[in-house]
Amino acid sequence: MEDRQKLEQMVTEINQLQQQGETITQQIEQLNQSLADITTAQEAVKGIKNATGKQTLVPIGAGCFIETELKSEDIIVGVGSDVAIKRSREETEKTLQTDKEEVQKLIGSLTEQLQKINEYIAQKRPEAERLMKETGVQ
């Protein structure tokens, strides 16, 4: 009976860790999307340097663009809760770089956690399989 209880505990623990791993994987995917968005914004901000007074194309979605003349290098930046502020191109570049570094750190940290979880599961799985054979549980 002791082996059976140990097996049940191991299976429960492995299942919980697998769910945690799936959650972390989803978080990493979301952060990778944020990272891609930040990179796209960085490229756009760099692209307007010294472009005041020039014609440019602005994406409006679904592969559509409008042609416009850039009147300023200032950028309207969302700061949360439907609030936006005007920042210089330089300030925006710094903010985006800081945001990018924070997201990269988070991705690194979550990837490390995921790796530890996967290693732990890989370490415990053979013992769980052995106990399954010994107790006759499928």
Swiss-Prot record:
Q: Name one GO cellular component term.
A: prefoldin complex
What is the annotated localization of this protein? Cytoplasm
- UniProt feature coiled coil, ranges: none
Alphabetical list of Gene3D superfamilies matching this protein: 1.10.287.370
InterPro entries in the cross-refs:
PFD_alpha_archaea, Prefoldin, Prefoldin_subunit_alpha
Keyword Chaperone found: yes
Is Chaperone given among the entry's keywords?
Answer: yes
Per the UniProt entry, what is one GO biological process?
Answer: protein folding
Keywords carried by this UniProt record: Chaperone, Cytoplasm
UniProt GO molecular function: unfolded protein binding
Q: Where is the signal peptide?
A: none
Q: Which CDD domains match?
A: Prefoldin_alpha_GimC
Query: What is known about what this protein does?
Result: Molecular chaperone capable of stabilizing a range of proteins. Seems to fulfill an ATP-independent, HSP70-like function in archaeal de novo protein folding.
Recorded family membership = Belongs to the prefoldin subunit alpha family.
Quaternary structure and interacting proteins, as annotated: Heterohexamer of two alpha and four beta subunits.
Q: What name does UniProt use for this protein?
A: Prefoldin subunit alpha
UniProt organism field: Methanosphaera stadtmanae (strain ATCC 43021 / DSM 3091 / JCM 11832 / MCB-3)
